[in-house]
């Protein structure tokens, strides 16, 4: 029973990490988004078609927290895109492996995008494949691989998924 309790506690901690992650994105706290990752993290967004074919090419590929911060600065000051908000829905969070202090998880996501005209659409759906580690500051993403099912990205992918 002790292992079950420990497994449930770990799952809940990861669930809360994911909720903080999407909370930062959905509530325009983008400057806090990189804090969810380790310094040596990997963050990538890849179409399912490429992932299924073993092709590593994605539409976003960041290899450390500095690149994530640069992405936010670019969004705030350099990129031009239509104002929008995201609302993430996640489900099916599962711990699939634990080894050497790393926890691998999978979950499903759907992002609804609302544009400045008030129109809302399903923007993207897919899966998160995450590697989570414990740090002195709590759980952090060491790797987040976003595999989107949607056949094409309808507008500029400005805000992280």
From Swiss-Prot:
Keyword annotations: Aromatic hydrocarbons catabolism, Dioxygenase, NAD, Oxidoreductase
Enzyme class: oxidoreductase
Annotated pathway: Aromatic compound metabolism; anthranilate degradation via hydroxylation; catechol from anthranilate: step 1/1
Entries under InterPro entries matching the protein: Anthranilate_1-2-diOase_ssu (IPR017640), NTF2-like_dom_sf (IPR032710), Rng_hydr_dOase-bsu (IPR000391), SnoaL-like (IPR037401)
Domain of life: Bacteria
GO molecular function, one term: anthranilate 1,2-dioxygenase (deaminating, decarboxylating) activity
Catalysed transformations (reactions): anthranilate + NADH + O2 + 3 H(+) = catechol + NH4(+) + CO2 + NAD(+); anthranilate + NADPH + O2 + 3 H(+) = catechol + NH4(+) + CO2 + NADP(+)
EC number: 1.14.12.1
Record's note on what induces expression: By anthranilate but not by benzoate or salicylate. Expression is positively regulated by the transcriptional regulator AndR.
GO terms under biological process: catabolic process
Family from the record: Belongs to the bacterial ring-hydroxylating dioxygenase beta subunit family.
Function: Oxygenase component of anthranilate dioxygenase multicomponent enzyme system which catalyzes the incorporation of both atoms of molecular oxygen into anthranilate to form catechol. Can also act on benzoate and salicylate but not on 2-chlorobenzoate or o-toluate.
Subunit structure: Part of a multicomponent enzyme system composed of a reductase (AndAa), a ferredoxin (AndAb) and a two-subunit oxygenase component (AndAc and AndAd).
Protein name: Anthranilate 1,2-dioxygenase small subunit
Organism: Burkholderia cepacia
Gene field: andAd
């Amino acid at each position: 029973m002790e292992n079950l309790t420990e497994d449930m506690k770990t799952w809940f901690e990861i669930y809360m990490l994911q909720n903080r992650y999407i909370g930062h994105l959905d509530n325009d706290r983008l400057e806090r988004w990189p804090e969810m990752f380790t310094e040596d993290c990997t963050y990538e967004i890849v179409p399912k078609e490429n992932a299924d074919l073993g092709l590593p090419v994605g539409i976003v590929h960041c290899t450390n927290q500095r690149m994530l911060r640069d992405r936010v600065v670019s969004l705030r000051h350099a990129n031009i895109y239509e104002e929008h908000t995201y609302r993430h829905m996640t489900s099916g969070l599962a711990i699939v492996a634990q080894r050497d202090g790393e926890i691998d998880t999978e979950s499903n996501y759907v992002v609804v995008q609302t544009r400045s005209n008030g129109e809302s659409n399903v923007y993207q759906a897919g899966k998160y494949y995450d590697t989570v580690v414990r740090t002195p500051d709590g759980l952090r993403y060491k790797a987040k691989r976003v595999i989107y099912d949607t056949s094409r990205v309808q507008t500029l992918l400005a805000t992280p998924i």
